[in-house]
Amino acid sequence: MKALVINYGVGNLYSISSALKRVGFEVTIDNKPRNDYDLIVFPGVGAFSAVAEFILRYRELFNDLRRSGTNFLGVCLGMQIMFEKGTEGKESNGLGWFKGIVDKINANVKLPHIGWDLVFEVKDSCELTYGLDKKYVYYVHSYVAYPTSGDYVYMKSQYGIEYPALVCDKNVVGTQFHPEKSSNTGKIFLENLKGWIKR
């Protein structure tokens, strides 16, 4: 099973690439999306506005790949870029695959939020969430998605406010947490992801 990790030109992609390899993916890192992969990964590095500029160059190709059935995983910022807009840096358009805006955590808490927190299911479980309910996952973020619909929110976490931890719609899945830093829970999720791709 082949995965393409998109290189936005910022950040270290080693962790997510290594985690995918550990569960059996063949991983390529490239800055151009292609249609000959089982999974395309938007990693969790950079700022929303900077990544939005990169995404804009390939927006139609990403949309075409999604419509053709290519599977996508977005991690942290990679999940956030799948929403309509983000305010980090400056207000910028995302891909719009999920309805809602990405904004700073609106609570009197220390930011960035770094560390372990529980995830909990908010909808009937899907293949992606098996074994994850009430388990600890790792976060590094100051911004969260504020969706206009809960239809695609399968898991949440809480840090001052409740926010989406895992979203999914057809062939697109996003996690606010970092599976590559979430120890055994992250490995469980990535194993689930392989099964979800084979569905």
UniProtKB/Swiss-Prot annotation:
Pathway: Amino-acid biosynthesis; L-histidine biosynthesis; L-histidine from 5-phospho-alpha-D-ribose 1-diphosphate: step 5/9
UniProt keywords, alphabetically: Amino-acid biosynthesis, Cytoplasm, Glutamine amidotransferase, Histidine biosynthesis, Hydrolase, Lyase
Record InterPro entries: Class_I_gatase-like, GATASE, Imidazole-glycPsynth_HisH
Cellular compartment(s): Cytoplasm
Disulfide bonds: none
GO biological process terms held by the UniProt record: L-histidine biosynthetic process
Sequence ranges assigned to domain Glutamine amidotransferase type-1 in this UniProt record: 2-199
Active-site residue numbers: C76, H178, E180
MF terms in GO: glutaminase activity; imidazoleglycerol-phosphate synthase activity; lyase activity
A cellular-component GO term for this protein: cytoplasm
Catalytic activity: 5-[(5-phospho-1-deoxy-D-ribulos-1-ylimino)methylamino]-1-(5-phospho-beta-D-ribosyl)imidazole-4-carboxamide + L-glutamine = D-erythro-1-(imidazol-4-yl)glycerol 3-phosphate + 5-amino-1-(5-phospho-beta-D-ribosyl)imidazole-4-carboxamide + L-glutamate + H(+); L-glutamine + H2O = L-glutamate + NH4(+)
EC number in record: 4.3.2.10, 3.5.1.2
Subunit structure: Heterodimer of HisH and HisF.
Role played: IGPS catalyzes the conversion of PRFAR and glutamine to IGP, AICAR and glutamate. The HisH subunit catalyzes the hydrolysis of glutamine to glutamate and ammonia as part of the synthesis of IGP and AICAR. The resulting ammonia molecule is channeled to the active site of HisF.
Name of the molecule in the record: Imidazole glycerol phosphate synthase subunit HisH
Native species: Saccharolobus solfataricus (strain ATCC 35092 / DSM 1617 / JCM 11322 / P2)
